[in-house]
Amino acid sequence: MQFTFEQIFIAMLLTLFAGFSTAIGSIIAFFSRKDDLRVLSLGLGFSAGVMIYISFMEILPTALKDFKNHYDSHWAELLGLACFFGGILISLLIDKLIPEDVNPHEPKEDLSELKICPLPQKGQNPPKFHPGEKLHQINTKALKRTGIFTALAIAIHNFPEGFATFISSLDNLTLGIAIAIAVAIHNIPEGLAVSLPIYHATGDKKKAFIYSALSGFAEPLGAFVGALILLPFIGDLTLAISFAVIAGIMVFISLDELLPAAKTYDKAHDSLYGLIAGMAIMALSLNLLGQ
């Protein structure tokens, strides 16, 4: 199966768009507090709805159809399901390899509400504060290190997402655009997770922004590696395997990352409303476009 330069270029652009949305999260970190981020609950729920719907209603069925071009129905379904759960396993292993204290998807105290204060050096008096004041003495070097390791953790997570966006965009531009938007929404709070500790530790907006943007660079890198490895061999069977694995990765991301993160910013049932809206809009758009 051959792809034109235009197809590859557009797929890479969509992956770049999805990856560098971490920079948007970085900018939000400079101006917003947690209480101002209720819209993230809707957005993350919406992103999860898009990913779950596409995975089960479009990508996995497409993979099974392609498998059936090479195997009988029984073996095609078994192979498709094996690749689907293989995608989940890959995501799970990546998640387990990252320590909890730097994993951006593990719950931790919201840094935006902390009053940052360096630990006193030897011979210095501790800082004074009034009873009841919420003051956290935080070693700014440790805080900065947390932000950097979080950036590395997010980069590892984003690598397979970049591959998923790129391959989907090559085969079906409509699906690729939907996935790119969903991944971009998902990356915004990840940019926050990187930017907040670095910004609070250093007071340097530029440095916090750069680290957030670089953490998203893994997505186009994942697309580039996928292109180098798979493009020479892409056919129905390769796409079938890729799509089934991608469906598993996207379902894991939705259930393990997006929905829990959406609940963090939730008020009432915002995350649920976003989830339903994402599914409904995706279903309607695919139907109208004849997918």
UniProtKB/Swiss-Prot annotation:
Subcellular location per the Swiss-Prot or TrEMBL entry: Cell inner membrane
Topological relation to the membrane, as annotated: Multi-pass membrane protein
Keywords, ordered alphabetically: Cell inner membrane, Cell membrane, Ion transport, Iron, Membrane, Metal-binding, Transmembrane, Transmembrane helix, Transport, Zinc, Zinc transport
TM ranges: 8-28, 39-59, 74-94, 147-167, 174-194, 209-229, 233-253, 271-291
Source organism, top-level taxon: Bacteria
Single annotated GO MF: zinc ion transmembrane transporter activity
Binding-site list for Fe(2+): 158, 161, 187, 190, 219
Single GO cellular component term: plasma membrane
Keyword Coiled coil: no
Alphabetized InterPro entries for the sequence: ZIP, Zn_transptr_ZupT
Ligand binding (Zn(2+)): 161, 186, 190
Reaction it catalyzes: Zn(2+)(in) = Zn(2+)(out)
The UniProt record lists the keyword tRNA-binding: no
Stated family: Belongs to the ZIP transporter (TC 2.A.5) family. ZupT subfamily.
Biological role stated in the UniProt entry: Mediates zinc uptake. May also transport other divalent cations.
Protein name: Zinc transporter ZupT
Originating organism: Campylobacter jejuni subsp. jejuni serotype O:2 (strain ATCC 700819 / NCTC 11168)
Name of the encoding gene: zupT
